[in-house]
């Protein structure tokens, strides 16, 4: 464990990796060498960082699988961020939590839609009743003979003088 965290050991491993790469690739004009060296350096650093972390985590915790899974997911997400990706790796637990949250939100929205639909149906029924009350219905022909002022009307034949008493007659007035 001490050897894993020792800086001199780490530097000697990096130096030996670089020497090995230089011996494998003897062409000095190799264009991809810096990229290969960078990737190998990152992988080596992750290896050096993850092994002690995993060992400490396994000794310190009772639930080793979850800790290892969390460490691996964190390392992969860090690599993805370093590479410039916006996506992230998630564990099943996180996915299940998100799914539960989404299902709860969908249930809440369905209840809201149900309440709103019920209210809208009630409003439509109320508007229908109001409309039915406001509609003018055709009325049958009213018998005007039953009105008060026309009950005792006499016809021209029924009058004694055969003259309408309500017609204006000639009036002479003095000046």
From Swiss-Prot:
GO terms for molecular function: channel activity; metal ion binding; toxin activity. One of its GO terms (cellular component) is host caveola. The keyword Nucleotidyltransferase does not apply. Glycans are attached at residues 8, 18. InterPro entries: Rotavirus_NSP4. It holds the Pfam family Rota_NSP4. It is found in: Host rough endoplasmic reticulum membrane; Host membrane, Host caveola; Secreted. Keywords: Activation of host autophagy by virus, Calcium, Enterotoxin, Glycoprotein, Host endoplasmic reticulum, Host membrane, Host-virus interaction, Ion channel, Ion transport, Membrane, Metal-binding, Secreted, Signal-anchor, Toxin, Transmembrane, Transmembrane helix, Transport, Viral ion channel, Virulence. Residues 1-28 are lumenal. The N-glycosyl content is primarily Man(9)GlcNAc, with a small amount of Man(8)GlcNAc. GO terms for biological process: monoatomic ion transmembrane transport; symbiont-mediated activation of host autophagy; viral process. Ca(2+) binds at residues 120, 123. It is a single-pass type III membrane protein. The chain crosses the membrane at residues 29-51. Residues 52-175 are cytoplasmic. Homotetramer. Interacts with the immature particle in the viroplasm. Interacts with host CAV1, early and late in infection. Interacts with host integrin ITGA1/ITGB1 heterodimer. Interacts with host integrin ITGA2/ITGB1 heterodimer. Interaction with microtubules blocks trafficking to the Golgi apparatus. Belongs to the rotavirus NSP4 family. Plays an essential role in the virus replication cycle by acting as a viroporin. Creates a pore in the host endoplasmic reticulum and as a consequence releases Ca(2+) in the cytoplasm of infected cell. In turn, high levels of cytoplasmic calcium trigger membrane trafficking and transport of viral ER-associated proteins to viroplasms, sites of viral genome replication and immature particle assembly. Binds 1 calcium ion per tetramer. This is Non-structural glycoprotein 4. It comes from Rotavirus A (strain RVA/Human/United Kingdom/ST3/1975/G4P2A[6]) (RV-A).
């Amino acid at each position: 464990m001490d050897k894993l965290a020792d800086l001199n050991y780490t530097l000697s491993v990096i130096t030996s990796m670089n020497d090995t790469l230089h011996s494998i690739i003897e062409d000095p004009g190799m264009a991809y060498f810096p990229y290969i060296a960078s990737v190998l350096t990152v992988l080596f650093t992750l290896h050096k960082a993850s092994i002690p972390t995993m060992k400490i985590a396994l000794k310190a915790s009772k639930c080793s699988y979850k800790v290892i899974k969390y460490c691996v997911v964190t390392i992969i997400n860090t690599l993805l961020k370093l590479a410039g990706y916006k996506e992230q790796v998630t564990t099943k637990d996180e996915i299940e939590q998100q799914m539960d949250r989404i299902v709860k939100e969908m249930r809440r929205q369905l209840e809201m839609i149900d309440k709103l639909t019920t209210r809208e149906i009630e409003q439509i029924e109320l508007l229908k009743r109001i409309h039915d009350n406001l509609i003018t219905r055709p009325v049958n022909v009213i018998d005007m003979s039953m009105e008060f002022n026309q009950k005792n009307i006499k016809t021209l034949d029924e009058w004694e003088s055969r003259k309408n008493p309500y017609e204006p007659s000639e009036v002479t007035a003095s000046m």
